[in-house]
């Protein structure tokens, strides 16, 4: 199970990075929009942190997506 969780974290982080770049946002801008720390955004994008449902909602909202849409982009 830990390997699967790590894979999901990486997939989600890559999706967040892809969406951020598609929206032409810096990590700092995304952190501001999602009301999260810059460090936390970096850790998510590197696949080092599992996000909570609240964080998922905040990130999706910053991209003007639903949480389900953001998860779908991560192929989760």
Please annotate each region the language model reported.
Residues 1-11:
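A detector for short, charged/polar N-terminal pre-domain segments
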Residues 14-33, 58, 63:
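Short basic helix-loop element that most often maps to the first helix and adjoining turn
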Residues 28, 39, 68:
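Key DNA-contact positions within bacterial/archaeal DNA-binding proteins
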Residues 35-50:
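Recognition helix of helix-turn-helix/homeodomain-like DNA-binding domains
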Residues 48-58:
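Short, basic-rich loop-to-helix N-cap that marks the start of a DNA-contacting helix
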Residues 56-60, 70-71:
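Hydrophobic micro-packing sites on short alpha-helices
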Residues 64-76:
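Short C-terminal boundary/hinge segments that cap the last helix of small helical domains
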